[in-house]
């Protein structure tokens, strides 16, 4: 009898446990459905405060969707998305670009916005994973007080002996702006536009000599050094350079006459996002005429939608020559090789 009672108790406990776990499974499915219908969105962003403040409140007002914004650096955010891939806590990653994320595209959902048709030809979503929304091209920031009448219009001008030791440049192995500036000079000086050609790297050798060993530790030090008059010219992003112009500093922004690179500041939908439809609405909103034009008129990032008006402190789009053969996917695949070549040429210059 005692044995039967024990057996009954065990079976009862097993039944309860099974019911509990079955209930948990059912609740998870219900939770997913509830989450999908919620008017909320979690955005992981590494963008500037000004850009976040332009886009997020406007999106909330227009859609009624509440945005939970997590702000951090690009590296930590990408690591977070990767660590959460089996149970995504975020819906959108608003950081980095294809060059940085190509090898991790399995972390993201394929989505091409209907607004993609309205973007510049070089800024369309060609992969399905990365949606270019704005661009921060690499430019020259020229201190007009120091440059005087000196011609600084393109990469050949940077080899002027008068600029030796007066060029602010970072380390392409550690600085994203320096790496993109390196890519621009490689495409500009490469034979038939080939960034791996001997001609491209011969130019790099001469450029390294004119920098005269003064490679800076951060992107910020480059544009600040030029604006403060420590250097005559710096190779940097357009955003900070245009900000100095906007604020009245004695500098000007120069897009190299040989060509410019427009790395798209992309937005990605996280694979398995709990609020997938809201995430798609966010991407659509980012590319909309309203937001692209507002950014062009008030900020110093470059909108990528066709026909958008820009503030007078921004260089008009029709005055910028773009490299037609620039391939962001190719650059992403060959980045390690290019950085290794840079390090090799830098080391050779010191011997």
Predicted feature descriptions by range:
Residues 1-40, 349-351:
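Short, low-complexity disordered leader/linker segments with a strong preference
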Residues 41, 45-66:
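Short, polar/charged alpha-helical segment
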Residues 45-52, 72-76, 82, 88-230:
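Extracytoplasmic ligand-binding site segments that recognize negatively charged/polar headgroups
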Residues 99-103, 227, 232-250:
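A ligand-binding cleft/hinge motif common to bilobed small-molecule-binding domains
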Residues 109-117, 130-131, 156-159, 249-261, ...:
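Short beta-strand->loop
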Residues 260, 265, 270-325:
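Mature extracytoplasmic/periplasmic domains
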């Amino acid at each position: 009898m005692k044995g039967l009672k024990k057996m009954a108790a065990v079976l009862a406990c097993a039944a309860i446990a099974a019911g509990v776990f079955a209930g948990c499974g059912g609740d998870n499915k219900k939770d997913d459905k509830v989450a999908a219908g919620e008017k909320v969105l979690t955005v992981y962003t590494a963008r500037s405060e000004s850009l976040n403040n332009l886009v997020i409140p406007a999106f909330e007002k227009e859609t009624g969707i509440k945005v939970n914004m997590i702000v951090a650096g690009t590296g930590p955010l990408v690591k977070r998305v990767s660590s959460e891939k089996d149970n995504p806590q975020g819906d959108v990653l608003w950081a980095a670009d294809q060059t940085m994320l190509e090898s991790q595209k399995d972390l993201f959902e394929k989505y091409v916005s209907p607004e993609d048709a309205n973007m510049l030809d070089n800024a369309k979503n060609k992969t399905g994973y990365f949606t270019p929304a704005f661009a921060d091209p690499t430019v020259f920031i020229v201190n007009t007080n120091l440059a005087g009448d000196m011609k600084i219009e393109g990469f050949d001008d940077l080899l002027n002996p008068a600029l030796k030791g007066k060029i602010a440049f970072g380390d392409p192995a550690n600085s994203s702006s320096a790496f993109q500036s390196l890519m621009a000079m490689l495409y500009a000086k490469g034979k038939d536009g080939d960034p791996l050609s001997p001609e491209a790297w011969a130019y790099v050798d001469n450029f390294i000599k004119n920098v005269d060993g003064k490679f800076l530790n951060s992107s910020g030090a480059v544009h600040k050094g030029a604006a403060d008059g420590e250097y005559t010219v710096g190779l940097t992003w357009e955003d900070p350079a245009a900000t100095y112009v906007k604020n009245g500093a004695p500098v000007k922004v120069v897009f190299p006459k040989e060509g410019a690179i427009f790395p798209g500041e992309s937005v990605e939908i996280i694979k398995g996002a709990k609020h997938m439809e809201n995430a798609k609405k966010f991407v659509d909103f980012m590319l909309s005429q309203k937001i692209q034009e507002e950014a062009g008129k008030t900020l110093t990032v470059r909108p990528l939608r066709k026909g958008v008006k820009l503030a007078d402190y921004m260089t008009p789009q029709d005055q910028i020559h773009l490299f037609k053969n620039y391939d962001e996917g190719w650059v992403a695949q060959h980045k390690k090789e290019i950085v290794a070549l840079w390090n090799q040429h830098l080391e050779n210059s010191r011997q």
